[in-house]
Regions:
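Conserved donor-binding/catalytic core segment of Leloir-type glycosyltransferases
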Residues: 7-9, 200-228, 239
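Glycosyltransferase donor-sugar binding loop
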Residues: 44-46, 237-253
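Membrane-proximal helix-turn-helix segments that form the acceptor-binding/catalytic region
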Residues: 81-86, 103, 107, 118, ...
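Acidic donor-binding loop of glycosyltransferase active sites
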Residues: 157, 280-299, 314
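Carbohydrate-associated surface elements
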Residues: 165, 186
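Acidic anion/phosphate-binding donor-loop and adjacent secondary structure
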Residues: 171, 187-204, 219
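Nucleotide-activated donor-binding/catalytic signature segment of Leloir-type glycosyltransferases, i.e.
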Residues: 242, 250-277
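Conserved acidic donor-binding segment of nucleotide-sugar-dependent glycosyltransferases
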Residues: 306, 330-341, 350-356
Length: 407
């Protein structure tokens, strides 16, 4: 049976105002433009979100993933994915982003696809405990997660990851370095436009921004503690914007405590990309306070929020970790000791006292992102990996070959 097309499957909500959805769209569109038809399969049962406008080469198939917990949701999604796949022709490539959709495909790889691409942005054996602390002591679940990850790592013909730290960890888990490609995240420079830092105004509170997941692995608690320290000396408002799970909302509100009553903290739901960019421009400093933990230092990551902040021109204070150093020099971002609210507060004060330093960081950060991290560069790297490592012919090459044959 002849193989046809690419299936890009992801156990992620799409569309959504999250980094994962931005990443999925960028990669699916690039694959469609380069190689022809792409079937994009993702979680699409969010109420009130319109179907995204995608290129003609990408067909979106939203699937449900309802369930009382993550395991139930994953099993529901797998069942829907299996039903969707029934009777479909064999794929040329299947591209997955996690074990939740990837494991059953890896098990049946020989009958489903010519090639399997496993894009590793994170691994549940490391990340799950931060979202669901009760699973940390479930040894049986952890064993299953590691086993399924290993099956996907071994079955993949191409492994893609956005971080060299992650690549090193995957090799330590037995991944073949010859099949591994590091492709950092990108930024839409037309959405995250540049503006120089805001000029200070007498009487206006200093406005800090934290964007992203409200979890300990991202360091939101360090941002709150730094806000408390700064309030001793000057008026401050810290804006927290991003997804907030129900069971973590209460803990976060407790952590905010008096800061909410004082009006020193505001909580915002996730914003569309254009509004998030405008919010950056309305703030004085962006905080990326990643802690030194196994998710950030062992598994690794490529924090999209850091790249987006650098693109906007608002000065950034970020943890001095390898995953940050890979994206930003100390002339582009003010890097501070991880896990230290005091270091964050002192860096913010330094920017306030030395606006010329903030302006220099701002311009250098934007220049770095324009040079190294436009989405086009990541898309080109992915297309090259498909062509060079998997031998997939570009659509233009196929049409030229067909035209020559018929001439």
């Amino acid at each position: 049976v002849a193989s046809s097309g690419i299936v890009y499957a992801s156990f992620d909500r799409f569309p959504a105002p999250k980094g994962a959805a931005v990443h999925i769209r960028a990669f699916a569109e690039a694959l469609g433009a380069a190689f022809g038809p792409v079937d994009l399969v993702a979680i699409g049962d969010a109420p009130g979100i319109p179907t995204p406008a995608l290129s003609n080469a990408v067909t979106y198939h939203p699937l449900g993933a309802r369930g009382k917990d993550l395991v139930a949701q994953a099993l529901t999604f797998r069942a829907h994915l299996g039903a969707w796949w029934h009777g479909r022709p064999r794929a040329k490539v299947v591209h997955v982003r996690s074990i939740f959709e990837g494991y059953p495909i890896a098990q049946r790889k020989a009958s489903l696809t010519d090639a399997l691409v496993y894009e590793v942005n994170g691994l549940p054996s490391i990340e799950l405990k931060y979202h669901h602390p009760d699973v940390a002591d479930d040894a049986e679940l952890m064993r299953k997660l590691v086993t399924q990850e290993d099956v996907c790592l071994q079955a993949a013909d191409l492994l893609v990851t956005p971080s060299a730290v992650t690549a090193e960890y995957l090799v330590s888990r037995g991944a073949d370095p010859q099949r591994l490609r590091v492709i950092p995240n990108g930024v839409d420079l037309d959405v995250f436009r540049y503006a120089p830092p805001r000029a200070p105004e007498p009487g206006r509170p200093l406005r800090l921004l934290y964007s992203g997941t409200m979890t300990s692995w991202q360091g939101v608690h360090h941002a709150l503690d730094a806000c408390r320290l700064l309030l001793r000396d000057l008026p401050v408002v810290l804006t927290l914007v991003g997804p907030l799970r129900k069971h973590t909302r209460r803990a976060l509100l407790d952590r905010c405590g008096d800061l909410l009553l004082q009006g020193a903290v505001e909580l915002l739901e996730p914003l569309p990309q254009e509004e998030l960019a405008r919010l950056h421009h309305a703030c004085d400093v962006v905080l990326v306070p990643l802690p030194a933990n196994d998710r950030n230092c062992l598994q690794g990551c490529c924090p999209l929020k850091l790249l987006e902040a650098m693109a906007t021109g608002t000065p950034v204070v970020a943890s001095d970790l390898p995953v940050v150093r890979a994206l930003a020099e100390d002339t582009e971002v003010l890097r501070v000791r991880p896990g230290s609210a005091k270091a964050i507060a002192e860096a913010v004060k330094a920017l306030l006292a030395h606006p010329i330093q903030g302006a220099a960081l701002s311009a250098a950060a934007r220049a770095r992102v324009e040079r190294d991290f436009p989405w086009g560069r990541a898309q080109e790297a992915l297309v090259n990996a498909y062509a060079d490592d998997l031998g997939i012919a570009r659509a233009s090459t196929r049409s030229n070959t067909a035209a020559s044959a018929s001439a």
